[in-house]
């Protein structure tokens, strides 16, 4: 206890040293912690997917144009994935510039068209109602979007007019996952609402354990005709890309920038380096300032040793002083 009191008295007496050292270390730690939180959030994108490393999307390459798509819309000279290896399969269609009508108000909406299997692969917290698309008219709204349309009213059972002229019924309200997500939307619609959508869907697969993904990619690397080559000589190839990797390939999702987020590994590496440098700078600055203070207190420590203070007590003084500074900075 005496050692603690002495250490505290020294820090209070040397106010300039304490303030400068404390501010330097606090700023360094604050910046490092903020950067580390950002880096961690980037590295945990889409962890709401039940198995993001083993849920795959179809990436097609048509004459150099890469994008997320599906195989079932290619009807000529193509190959499908053997259902014996598939544990779960779903599709989704992103509609970035869509809208719904509530009363007389036309409200822009980012719509995601899918089916109930989607929720077997991606976990979304349910805030109100139920998380299902049991009927073609079923719709799920995000909590933020529901508040935008209905305010504080109960949105469950409310009817909206979709852009194709059909009515949709709000069945549930979904919350935001704790992690950052690649796909962002306002409304989830049932794929059964219409037989004809304005764009092609993207297929997602979860394969059974032991499935040879490399063999599927090898098969997909063989060019195949999109249509009858007598009229259309274009070819396409396909490969599987995991949900974990989609976020890091912005070229696949840059057509819908308002619905899809993407990251950059190079930026993350640079930020990691900056974070490390900030942390090292703060630590070195802390050590240098304390060494200067230690040199100035050389006579004081010498007198203490003359009066019988042991080395362990002096070390405890130094250790407690630094611990108090670090804890204060944090």
Question: Residues of each region from the PLM?
Answer:
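Glycine-rich segments within core transmembrane alpha-helices of 12-TM secondary carriers
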Residues: 28, 325-330
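Structured, solvent-exposed hinge/loop segments at the ends of secondary-structure elements
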Residues: 32-154, 162-169, 199, 218
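Mid-to-C-terminal secondary-structure elements
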Residues: 115-127, 139-263
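N-terminal membrane-entry
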Residues: 259-278
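Short, strongly hydrophobic transmembrane alpha-helices
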Residues: 14-41
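Intracellular coupling helices
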Residues: 4-20, 24, 284-325
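Short, solvent-exposed beta-strand edge segments and adjacent coil->beta transition regions
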Residues: 55, 200-204, 298
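Hydrophobic alpha-helical transmembrane segments of multipass integral membrane proteins
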Residues: 25, 29-32, 273-283
